[in-house]
Amino acid sequence: MASVNIKPLEDKILVQANEAETTTASGLVIPDTAKEKPQEGTVVAVGPGRWDEDGEKRIPLDVAEGDTVIYSKYGGTEIKYNGEEYLILSARDVLAVVSK
């Protein structure tokens, strides 16, 4: 995973999606047009967290750089940076962290 010069704001995270499956369990090749959008990726960068209701301290996020996460299917904004595709998600769009 390469270093990226993108720093998310507040409770946003930058995720690089894992590759979608190209073949089925039975060996059938899935064309690009039929592939499901991946819902799993690696966290590349994390924002500092949003402010609490009083605006006095930041609420830390539950994810960290390097975590593998599962996120909402239609959550986030897709971006392309230096030829790589990323997704900027709100921390609320992250459904789970995958244990290694």
Curated annotation (Swiss-Prot):
The record's annotation in Pfam families points to: Cpn10
Query: Which PROSITE patterns does this entry report, sorted A to Z?
Result: CHAPERONINS_CPN10 (PS00681)
| SMART domains reported for this sequence | Cpn10
| Keywords of the record | Chaperone, Cytoplasm
User: Which GO MF terms does the UniProt record name?
Assistant: ATP binding; metal ion binding; protein folding chaperone; protein-folding chaperone binding; unfolded protein binding
What broad class describes the main subcellular location of this protein? cytoplasm
Compartments reported by the entry: Cytoplasm
Entry superkingdom: Bacteria
Q: Which GO terms describe its biological process?
A: chaperone cofactor-dependent protein refolding
Q: Whom does it interact with, and what assembly results?
A: Heptamer of 7 subunits arranged in a ring. Interacts with the chaperonin GroEL.
UniProt xrefs under HAMAP family: CH10 (MF_00580)
Could you say which protein family the record assigns here? Answer: Belongs to the GroES chaperonin family.
Functional description taken from the UniProt entry: Together with the chaperonin GroEL, plays an essential role in assisting protein folding. The GroEL-GroES system forms a nano-cage that allows encapsulation of the non-native substrate proteins and provides a physical environment optimized to promote and accelerate protein folding. GroES binds to the apical surface of the GroEL ring, thereby capping the opening of the GroEL channel.
- What name appears for this protein in its UniProt entry? Co-chaperonin GroES
